[in-house]
UniProtKB/Swiss-Prot annotation:
Residues 179-192, 231-247, 261-283, 306-321, 338-359 have a biased composition (Basic and acidic residues). This is Putative cell signaling protein HAM1. The lineage of its organism: Eukaryota, Fungi, Dikarya, Basidiomycota, Agaricomycotina. The keyword Coiled coil applies. It holds the Pfam family HAM1_N.
């Protein structure tokens, strides 16, 4: 029999069966379904799948027609904002329908992943073995990581980044004074911008300061105490990852665990199809004999195929013509006639752009330059440049820099020589890859998609201009010589310590810049302008596309109604933000009020325990009443002699938490005792209700002065439980549970009370120990050297963290294993359950199967409003069932064909 129904009530004295939010079966089921649908969509994306247009359209239409908030509760401004958002969604739906009507984007992405680039292999051509190339790649990656680490951990580089941020905030605040005064940095920070950091210093993990003969570790900290840490010379897979619980594992282990979950889930389907592959291969052998006949009769009317063949044919014609007349018809970049033609074409393209637009762009660019020059004067720019050079010089003095940079430059020169050796072979190899249907389809599809978004404007002119620049570089010996000189200069800058600060370095850089202008601003300027003009024409068409214009207008209107008034000035809208506070936020809290836990398992040497279909309600678990009292007393004297003999301050703090409740229904449990007496197993359903005032906790702390071994004492911890109801049903021992229920209720209350008190005593004791050590360390550092207090705290917390990890590891060895199950392969005891047919965990596994089912890139998991979704029905999706049936048919055909194949082989 279930526990009596609870009712929702929020008051100072709620009824005995009242909770903050009574559990609603329909709402719980709705929350579970929505979260499982989201889980399925995420799993499908992880599996490399994408939603089709129908699935995208159905979700957008549903979002447009179903507002998550009651519009009548919103202000007029709030309703306008909702309509703006709906207009944006409708425009996105139209873009998907018109620009991607044949699902070109999904097919292009799929094709790009399934192109066979192995056809580019040229055996016997490359004078470096595969093993040597792999080893060089690993060594290069290690050296690059070392160089990046040296620059990122250098004190001067870190201060430069900080100073750039301060200057950027100041510029932003100046450009938008009314809107961003709060973002402006203080004058003290601005004054420190031009100051240099300590020389020859690198910052390692936990802020440790290192010298030029030490290699710093990289440490990246995340929220909740998570962090990643690794040595730059190590393989990235050996990087140490620490989660929010303090558990440490390598990046390789984390990646392998994720891959194992994916591969194991697919293994069953692969086993079913393995026997069918042999049967399919025999059919392929027969089909290949007819392949050439079929290829000659291919339908040329399919739009994408026809376009692909036209593009390929044009490319082949252009290649043949170029090869036949290579020595006679190559355009001479020095010929004045060719340059005049290019300039004329560029001028014609520029004339297409309205003078008003060109003038507006020029004015905007000039204003931006003037503004930056005012905010960043030449003196500050020179100082920043000098400090950047200083970073390079300091890194050049580090022992790891010379080794890494020398190896990289030498290896680059080595492979550059190999590249010349295989240049001609590489052309053939690239053509082989381009002829692969998947690669060719992907290239054409992406290009077609871009042209559709530019209102049908072709990209042919852009690629022609780009090809012309490539031809210029290939045919100009002077330009190649300039690049050689530039390469020599970069070698000296990167390898010779201090050369970057020498006047010869600046002089040679100016000479290279001046000589380069002859190529980039004079000789090939017309070709560059042609490319830029073609790009500008195409981007103009992109910006004038009706749907792109409509989407931009929708977003502008949404931002205007959200942030600006009718005059276009940034303004605060109190009614709109009241809607956010009073309507939107409560709605969001309701959406996350239930936290479903499909399956949790615990196992040790004495018991296996499984909890399924557990729902935690946030509003119930959070205390409804929080009461804080604080008593503070201070005493002092104007005479130092008296101050030394008196307690200067005393504090007392009291915290009361009340109405911590729970309304947990229909939780499935199963357990199996493996030792002790009696050895039994059972499964069933349980209800647990903490109602009324629920759990109340009252704690009082008092400070203790003039003692180095403690900071505060705990005067008392009172815990009280008001209403506790529980019920167990559908088990094998219902009679036993009913018999002991009345006695067990009191025992459970006392056990919960004692557990909460002991846990709080232990937690407060640990807090007192930590505060004592922090206070004592800071006092010692303050007496010795003012500048070491921060470092003392860092060292202290580093040791505390290591100690906590050791204690946790020791605790894990003594206790059992607890897991919240997220996939079927992580279950400790998969056979231990109450009712597998109704389990949320089993339903989640079927959602995962649906996410990995579908032809090519498709998946039924994206059908979020499909009534046949496994999250709704609890059954396999029809697509999964059909796939299983098809696999079984293929298996039967393979088995039936096996005797015939064997007999034919024997006769041969």
């Amino acid at each position: 029999m279930s526990v009596a129904a609870t009712k929702s009530e929020i008051s100072h004295n709620p009824g005995k069966m009242s909770v903050t939010s009574a559990v609603s079966g329909e709402k719980v089921e709705g929350d579970v379904q929505s979260r499982m649908k989201l889980f399925g969509a995420i799993q499908a994306f992880r599996d490399g799948r994408m939603p089709d247009n129908e699935q995208i359209g159905s979700v957008l239409e549903y979002a447009i027609g179903h507002s998550p908030v009651d519009l009548q509760k919103l202000s007029p401004e709030g309703r306008v904002l909702i309509e703006d958002f709906r207009d944006t969604l409708e425009t996105l739906r139209m873009i998907v329908h018109e620009k991607n009507s044949d699902e070109l984007f999904q097919n292009a992405v799929w094709s790009s992943y399934h192109g066979d680039v192995s056809k580019a292999k040229q055996d016997g051509v490359i004078p470096v073995s595969n093993e040597q190339a792999k080893q060089d790649g690993k060594t290069a990656a290690s050296h690059i990581r070392v160089l990046i680490t040296l620059f990122l951990t250098n004190s001067e580089a870190r201060k430069l980044l900080k100073d750039f941020g301060i200057v950027g905030r100041d510029i932003f605040a100046t450009a938008a004074t009314k809107a961003a005064d709060k973002s402006r940095p203080s004058q003290e920070k601005l004054d420190s911008v031009d100051q240099e950091a300590p020389s020859h210093e690198w910052i390692g993990a936990d802020g440790k300061r290192l010298g030029p003969n030490e290699t710093p570790d990289i440490q990246i900290k995340g929220p909740g105490g998570t962090q990643a840490r690794y040595h730059p010379r190590d393989d990235p897979r050996d990087a140490q990852l620490v989660d929010d619980k303090g558990k440490t594992r390598s990046a390789g282990e984390a990646y392998n665990q994720a891959q194992e979950a994916k591969s194991d889930a697919q293994s069953k389907a692969q086993d079913l199809k393995s026997s069918a592959r042999d049967y399919k291969e025999t059919g392929k052998q027969q089909a290949r004999s007819h392949a050439q006949d079929v290829a000659g009769n291919r339908d040329p009317n399919a739009s994408l195929s026809e376009q692909k063949e036209q593009v390929k044919g044009a490319a082949y014609d252009k290649r043949d013509a170029a090869n036949a007349q290579a020595d006679q018809n190559l355009p001479d970049p020095n010929d004045e006639g060719n340059q005049e033609k290019a300039r004329g074409k560029a001028a014609a393209l520029r004339d297409r752009i309205p003078e008003e637009h060109r003038q507006k762009a020029a004015d905007y660019i000039q204003k931006s330059k003037n503004f930056v020059n005012d905010e960043l004067p030449e003196e500050r720019r020179d100082q920043f440049i000098y400090r950047l050079k200083k970073v390079v010089v300091e890194c050049q003095g580090h022992k790891d820099y010379q080794e890494a940079m020398t190896w990289l430059l030498d290896t680059l020169e080595n492979y550059r020589g190999h590249a010349k050796h295989v240049a001609n072979k590489g052309t053939e190899s690239a053509q082989t890859v381009a002829n692969d249907p998947a690669v060719g389809d992907s290239t054409i599809q992406f290009r077609t998609l871009l042209e559709r978004f530019a209102n049908g404007k072709s990209l042919d002119n852009v690629f022609s201009a780009l090809d012309q620049i490539y031809t210029d570089v290939q045919n100009d010996s002077e330009l190649r010589e300039w690049f050689t000189t530039f390469n020599d200069y970069m070698h000296r800058v990167l390898l010779e310590p201090g050369y970057i600060l020498d006047e010869d370095s600046d002089r040679e850089a100016r000479q290279l810049r001046e000589s380069g202008r002859r190529f980039f601003q004079d000789k090939y300027k017309a070709h560059q302008e042609l490319l830029f003009d073609e790009l500008q024409v195409w981007l103009t068409a992109f910006g004038e596309d009706p749907l792109n214009v409509r989407l931009g207008d929708d977003i502008k209107r949404f931002c205007k109604d959200l942030l600006f008034n009718h005059e276009g000035n940034l303004t605060f809208k109190p009614k709109l933000w009241n809607d956010v506070r009073q309507v939107l936020l409560p709605m969001l809290l309701k959406q996350v009020s239930y936290v479903p836990i499909p399956r949790a398992e615990y196992s040790d040497n004495s018991i296996d325990l499984v909890i399924e279909d557990l729902i935690l309600s946030g509003p119930n678990l959070f205390p409804n009443l929080v009461h804080i009292e604080s008593f503070n007393s201070f005493s002092f004297s104007p005479y130092p002699k008296l101050n030394k003999t008196m307690d200067n301050q005393h504090h007392k703090f009291r915290l009361s938490l009340s109405q911590i409740q729970a309304d947990i229904r229909d939780v499935a449990f199963a357990f199996r005792r493996k030792s002790g007496w009696p050895k039994l197993s059972d499964h069933g359903l349980a209800d647990v209700v903490l109602a009324g005032k629920g759990i109340s906790v009252d704690v009082e702390l008092e400070s203790i002065e003039n003692r180095r071994d403690t900071v505060f004492k705990t005067n008392f911890i009172h815990v009280n439980i008001d209403t506790l109801k529980f019920s167990i049903r559908n088990s094998k021992h219902d009679l036993l549970y009913k018999f002991i229920k009345s006695t067990a209720t009191g025992l459970i209350k006392r056990a919960i009370t004692a557990a909460v008190q002991n846990a709080m005593h232990t937690a407060l004791g640990h807090l007192d120990e930590q505060l004592v050590e922090v206070r004592n360390r800071v006092d010692e550092a303050k007496q010795s050297d003012e500048t070491t207090r921060t470092q003392a705290l860092k060292d202290l917390y580093s040791r505390k963290k290591e100690s906590a990890q050791e204690k946790k590891a020791a605790a894990d060895e003594k206790t059992g294993t607890f897991k919240i199950i997220t996939d079927r392969d992580s279950q400790l005891n998969p056979e231990l359950t109450h009712d597998g047919g109704k389990s949320w965990a089993k339903r989640a596994f079927k959602v995962e199967d649906a996410a990995r089912t579908g032809k090519e890139w498709r998946s039924p998991a994206f059908n979020l409003i499909d009534p046949a979704h496994p999250a709704v029905t609890g059954q396999h999706h029809p697509a999964v069932q059909n796939a299983d049936v098809e696999s079984e048919k293929l298996k039967q055909r393979a088995e039936a064909a096996a005797p015939g194949v064997a007999a034919g082989t024997k006769r041969m």
